[in-house]
Amino acid sequence: MISKSRKTKETDITVSLDINGNGKSKIDTGVGFLDHMLDSFSKHSLIDLEITCKGDTHIDDHHSVEDIGIVLGALFAEALYPVSNMERFGSANIVMDEACVSCDLDLSNRPYLVYEVNLAGKVGQFDTELVEEFFRAFVLNARISTHIVLQRGKNRHHIIEAAFKAVAVALRRAMQKNERVGIPSTKDML
């Protein structure tokens, strides 16, 4: 496992991960719904993940959610690059009851996020617009091109969980070892 910490006036975060793990997790962000999503992300990506966060959640969850995405993304990039002997591209359509979310991604070292999941409101006390903030912070710092698209769904919890699982499975597929591909780019570098 490798680790990274970040401390600001708003948050104090430590993240450890192993991209070649078994999907074990120990998550304590101070944001219960995010803990649930990150546990699911770890399980379905097979990335071992430990996260602790103490944040100013008495204000709201925004700083904690975004800063966790920043630290997790930066640590993921540290573990991943340079990409070699991996598939590089990954896709997943994840169904959770009535909800279906797709994720297509490229371990390109070029960050870009397309997020077409139009949600408003809350799941419990969790503001649903924070999901986009998390993924934007993660993708920009992980330096991956990622498209997350809601195909259908009504239940906010199901939609968000399907999104986290779709990203997780797409990452697992993109990180699949393939010794034949070498550096998976015609540029011979990523």
From Swiss-Prot:
Q: Recorded GO terms, molecular function?
A: imidazoleglycerol-phosphate dehydratase activity
What this protein catalyses is: D-erythro-1-(imidazol-4-yl)glycerol 3-phosphate = 3-(imidazol-4-yl)-2-oxopropyl phosphate + H2O
User: Where does this chain mainly localize?
Assistant: cytoplasm
What does the entry give for GO biological process? Answer: L-histidine biosynthetic process
Q: Record's Gene Ontology CC terms? A: cytoplasm
Source organism, top-level taxon: Bacteria
Sequence similarity: Belongs to the imidazoleglycerol-phosphate dehydratase family.
Q: Which PANTHER family match?
A: IMIDAZOLEGLYCEROL-PHOSPHATE DEHYDRATASE (PTHR23133:SF2), IMIDAZOLEGLYCEROL-PHOSPHATE DEHYDRATASE HIS7 (PTHR23133)
This protein is called: Imidazoleglycerol-phosphate dehydratase
Q: Give the organism the record lists.
A: Sulfurimonas denitrificans (strain ATCC 33889 / DSM 1251) (Thiomicrospira denitrificans (strain ATCC 33889 / DSM 1251))
